[in-house]
Amino acid sequence: MSTLRELRLRRALKEQSMKYRLSIKKTLPRWKGALIGLFLICVRTISGSGSESNLPEPPKVSVDSSLMIEPNLTTEMLNVFSQ
């Protein structure tokens, strides 16, 4: 009788372990994909910051002197109020 009980117990444990393995197989690819994505983000960030990439220089803008206002409005107002 103990052998039948042991066989049933072994069978039940085997079924439980199979269910556990199947559930791991379903959730493991999700975790694996998330970890691979996180790893790739880290690698890209590290390689991007260490590459010392040369950014294009901003264009040097020159302003035509005829567009500049002489005298300045504040100095003109100070002259008006000081008189």
Curated annotation (Swiss-Prot):
Residues 1-50 form the signal peptide. Belongs to the T7likevirus o-spanin family. Pfam families: O_Spanin_T7. Homodimer. Interacts (via C-terminus) with the spanin inner membrane subunit (via C-terminus). Part of the spanin complex which spans the entire periplasmic space. The spanin complex is composed of spanin inner membrane subunit and spanin outer membrane subunit. GO terms for biological process: killing of cells of another organism; viral release from host cell. Keywords: Cytolysis, Host cell lysis by virus, Host cell outer membrane, Host membrane, Lipoprotein, Membrane, Signal, Viral release from host cell. It is a lipid-anchor. Component of the spanin complex that disrupts the host outer membrane and participates in cell lysis during virus exit. The spanin complex conducts the final step in host lysis by disrupting the outer membrane after holin and endolysin action have permeabilized the inner membrane and degraded the host peptidoglycans. Host outer membrane disruption is possibly due to local fusion between the inner and outer membrane performed by the spanin complex. Coiled coil: none annotated. It comes from Enterobacteria phage T3. This is Spanin, outer lipoprotein subunit. The gene is 18.7. GO terms for cellular component: host cell plasma membrane; membrane.
